[in-house]
Amino acid sequence: MPRRLRPTRLEHVVDGHALRARLSAAALDSIGNEAEQRARAIDILKQALFRGRMIAKERLENGASGVETSRLLSGVTDEVITALYDFTTVHVFRARNPTEGERLCLLAVGGYGRGTLAPFSDIDLLFLRPYKQTPHAESVIEYMLYALWDLGFKVGHASRTIEECVRLSKEDFTIRTSILEARRLTGDERLAEDLKKRFRDEVMKATGAQFVAAKLKERDDRQARAGASRYMVEPNVKEGKGGLRDLHTLMWIAEYLHPVDRPEDVFKMEVFSIRETKAFIRAFDFLHAVRAHLHFTTGRPEERLTFDLQPEIARRMGYGDRGDAPAVERFMRRYFLIAKEVGTLTRAFSAKLEAEHFKNEPKGISRFLPGARPKRKALDVEGFYEDGGRLNIEGQEIFEADPVNLIRLFKIADERDLDLHPDAFTAVTRALPLITSRVRRDPDACRAFLDLLARGKRSYRTLTLMNDAGVLGRFIPEFGRVVAQMQFNMYHSYTVDEHTLRAVGVIGDIAAGRLVDDHPLAVSIMPLIEDREALFLAMLLHDTGKGGVGGQEKAGARSARSACERLGVERSKVELVAWLVENHLVMSDFAQKRDVSDPGTVAAFARIVENPERLRLLLVITVADIRAVGPGVWNGWKGQLLRELYNATEAVFRGGRGSDAAANVQRHQESTAEAARAALLETDPAAKGWVAAMENAYFSAFSQDDLFHHAELARRAAIQGGAAAEGQVRPGSNAAEVVIAAKDRRGLFADLALAISSLGGNVVGARVFTSRQGQALDVFYVQDVTGAPFGCENPRALRRLADALEAAGKGDALAVEPRRGSEQTRAAAFAIAPSVTIDNDASNDATVVEASGRDRPGLLHALAKTLADSALSIQSAHIDGYGERAVDAFYVQTTEGGKVTDTRKLNALKADLLAALEQNEASAPAARPGLRRARASVAR
């Protein structure tokens, strides 16, 4: 980390006296030439501003604090603006005998009024006058504003009388807040004092509760706009939850109710403990530093800590790689821990406000707290009571007397469907050191926690409260190690702990039947699961191996064993939980990267799973894990693949122990296909040839309606020159389904993939079938560049896509450059190591090739063309994506119809695919000029 620098004196950066002397000299040298006079003044002020900003930037990069930097920038801006004011009122529009009405005062308001300024923030100014606007004041204001714009400032300004300020402050809380922070820069001092007095007496007096209510609502609305979770992996430093604006809100409320000018002064209110006061100052400083670095790095008022900026800000703030922890992830973990602290401070502040105002203003506070004045209601648990619909405690001593109460508190809150009172929450955060190794092994504490986890009414909400308070990570240290941990990739939308708790919440929703429309299979098998406790424990601990030694899955299994043994879980359950954690990615890997219609695939999966109970547990965990990754990650296509794999594996287990798994799958496929063939022929006797030509696996992959339409499409293809295609967007689907029937040939799949990408389509899934007569039927699941179903808003675009596929199917596809999507700019932040694996054991009759690299339009075409150029035919393709990374698996055969067994050909194929992936990586656009990429995390 850079060493801390001592604060510097403002006059060592911008000498106000010397600046004014230079401006006066320039004015005297250019008397009679207003244009030259103005130009020279602007040039002098620009130099001062540039010097001030560069010194602030250099000091920040060498260890100056965030708050010191923001105050220095504010001070530099003060000197420039006040010097401009003096120049304007002395040399340009001098009032030699100013009247009472020509008095003018210039005040900084809003964030600038606080005296803390980010490098490229807007500045808000108030020109205060005693009466109506005079020609002199109007001239001064206009001249100054144009000059400030020429200096590069973005200025928010108002010209008002004191009367107008008071009236508007009563009507508008935004104006009221800006006046609250008003700070005189220059001009008539009496006007500023009069405004301050009238604002305090006529606006602030007896309106504390009203102001608090408005600010809290404003905070809630802002967080809803910016993203309600403080654990979004591209946070808004200013407006996001846990960001600077949350601290500003506390300061506004504090200053409105008490005279507070600096963050350090909050301590004088005795709102926070000494530890909490230090946390407040630490958070305030850290967030100011991050924001200043963001502005200096981008050269503009950038407030979002986007992926492309995170590595550079980490470097500037002194973070380096440490072991397996990259610098960017260490920095972002620090950011999220600070955001978490801000949430804790907000609750502590709320508790203090509530206690103080029920004592001093019993009628006022009720306007913004739920209901009327809270009523105390005794509970049948000693030390706890209900306080206005929230759970509270008799005092801190109940934790000191029995630290297990720190766990019981949350269990009682869950059982009785109560939120925590801010007093109780604050008491918990102050009692965290009481959670020792003895408490972690206490049978009562362990039983209370396990009951809450597996049988809680609202597990996500209660566990989130425990996590926010610091109890969850303290009681389960394995979980504590991933609190606030982010993974530097585009796949995950949340930190590891937030993702985990959301996944636990999804299981709770599945168990309650709330997700039956989205996950009918998971909901239907939930009552059959024998060990719910193992299910919830595995979900809670499934990602605790991230950042561990020996790989995510094995490290996670070790963590799970450690946690379960300490919780007193029986041995057989410990091993089950550890197995689930170690294998929690297996089902999604098999479903999304392998051919689930291949008996060998299902047999291999069944050998890993071993029994129906594990299969049920793994399905629910897989669904919850994928769904909790972030918006848009789960889709119906993934659900369909998981259902197919589950049903096929369940059929294996129904065949009994000792039976041949692959043979069981084959028998299941044969019976399914026989029934589907009969049903299709009954509906469409003309499909007899098509039915006879297709393999069994095809019939278990689609509904009867789909089979009927495919048969019609195949007939159309024969009539209209060898290819026919059609597309549709099914209700509730997040991808368009485009089906093409065409005569199979080498390179067909590559041509089809190129046609899709050339129209801006992104293939998120594909199924490839070939009849015994050489007729191909390929089904593509396609999104547009925004991630929406292709053509969902424009049916003509979907028709154009079908036409393009028909043309490609006939062999006359246009060689067009694939369109670049907007996501490519975000993905440019990551350095992605390509990889290729070739497996000749995964299938009985095909070689499985898996290629992983940077996702981009046209990648699927490039890989498929490489396979075609190697004289290989694609039997099936499985497209998967993890944010910036694509993982495409192909089942391929030689021209003779078998596996690729020649070692030299396998090595050449791997080299060619790696070359295609590496060329793709090398040609990827830069995120921003001058920014370096950081290695993308491969953790899932």
UniProtKB/Swiss-Prot annotation:
Keywords: Hydrolase, Magnesium, Multifunctional enzyme, Nucleotidyltransferase, Repeat, Transferase. InterPro entries: ACT-like_dom_sf (IPR045865), ACT_dom (IPR002912), HD/PDEase_dom (IPR003607), HD_domain (IPR006674), NT_sf (IPR043519), PII_UdlTrfase/GS_AdlTrfase (IPR013546), UTase/UR (IPR010043). Residues 1-379 are annotated as: Uridylyltransferase. SMART domains: HDc. Residues 496-618 form the HD domain. NCBIfam families: PRK05092.1, UTase_glnD. Pfam families: GlnD_UR_UTase (PF08335), HD (PF01966). Has four distinct domains: an N-terminal nucleotidyltransferase (NT) domain responsible for UTase activity, a central HD domain that encodes UR activity, and two C-terminal ACT domains that seem to have a role in glutamine sensing. It catalyses: [protein-PII]-L-tyrosine + UTP = [protein-PII]-uridylyl-L-tyrosine + diphosphate; [protein-PII]-uridylyl-L-tyrosine + H2O = [protein-PII]-L-tyrosine + UMP + H(+). Residues 737-821, 848-929 form the ACT domain. SUPFAM superfamilies: ACT-like (SSF55021), Nucleotidyltransferase (SSF81301), Nucleotidyltransferase substrate binding subunit/domain (SSF81593), Poly A polymerase C-terminal region-like (SSF81891). This is Bifunctional uridylyltransferase/uridylyl-removing enzyme. Modifies, by uridylylation and deuridylylation, the PII regulatory proteins (GlnB and homologs), in response to the nitrogen status of the cell that GlnD senses through the glutamine level. Under low glutamine levels, catalyzes the conversion of the PII proteins and UTP to PII-UMP and PPi, while under higher glutamine levels, GlnD hydrolyzes PII-UMP to PII and UMP (deuridylylation). Thus, controls uridylylation state and activity of the PII proteins, and plays an important role in the regulation of nitrogen assimilation and metabolism. PROSITE patterns: ACT (PS51671), HD (PS51831). Its EC number is 2.7.7.59, 3.1.4.-. PANTHER family: BIFUNCTIONAL URIDYLYLTRANSFERASE/URIDYLYL-REMOVING ENZYME, BIFUNCTIONAL URIDYLYLTRANSFERASE_URIDYLYL-REMOVING ENZYME. It comes from Caulobacter vibrioides (strain NA1000 / CB15N) (Caulobacter crescentus). Its cofactor is Mg(2+). GO terms for biological process: regulation of nitrogen utilization. Belongs to the GlnD family. GO terms for molecular function: [protein-PII] uridylyltransferase activity; phosphoric diester hydrolase activity.
